């Protein structure tokens, strides 16, 4: 019975909404019949934003201004009314009086609905209650809203609806807009910092025949004109390294990459990656760059080198910790992989600690599994985890003193991997052997393994200088800078399952 009542209530609400929407259409058609079609207006000259007026009231009081935005509130009181208009930067109140705007215009204004986009021209003043406002001389309907906005933000609490109708979410929730303003600042700050360090921004192909540079399944497509199967890139790496070979000593790219993987709070199949490569340095140089870059971005975007995410506070002002993967596992799991003699012993350890592994896994793979299980969650403060096993690092230069490990680091904060960096492998013969090992892994069932890229090997054979490289996930960086709980909160239009028609 309760469910039936809920269905009846929901149906009644939908019927009421449909009636209100029809009233809006009727109002539009009446305006159009009277030669006042708002959709025929092509431009409107705006002189100020709302916050500009509020911040500069003393110099603007009594001056004529023009604003435009969405009407979010209206109160009609006989011969005079108040409304709030929301623009890019905030809201401002307008006082609309019949004697000032004229009888016909005032009659039209009284029929306008919350959600309509208005242009208001008038003089700046302060009401008796002290609110900075505009005394309207002209009110122009610039666009008619034919749908009903939620009355308050609690009218759009369904997260699925918020992501699908981000345009409504942005209107109703100022915090959402602020998040994406900060996202833009993050990206512009990265560009400003790297440009100042002598890096050059470049663009490389998104459609590729061989999707390499990361461990991930690619999306596949078909190029009709060439009758060829292509893939969407999963990384920016291999083309940027080709540019290092070509003599571009410092390059970076900020671009979309695509990985055919699952959805969760930290993963979206298309996301924004920044990769950079610098000739004549190594992974230690990349650590220094990462520290300086993160501090710079935090200061530019948040005004502080102290970040708060959920219950954690991270201090970027102190030197970032540096620890090897072996030492990290020893510290948090009390297991010293330097004392593990071979793959068989590593697998036995995994079984004893109930860590699942695959038959193809070797000692280095299992070290990484222990790291993921026992260490990652503890890495709250900024930490560089260095010297990964060679098995999980096919594009990285070996450590000269121990060929079982490579010159690689992952940057962690809040228990998350935030960046991945290498001393880049530039030995073409070694790289070919790594590709061959990856091909074997693919044949054994690893769908994320890399394939041999002959053109990239040819580029290495031309000669690539010692190089340091790093990749940052922009979306996670924005999550951290805005204290956003999910990656979808920092993507304007995240990937969503299609609604069945």
Place the predicted regions along the sequence by residue:
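Class II aminoacyl-tRNA synthetase catalytic cores and aaRS-like
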Residues: 1-501
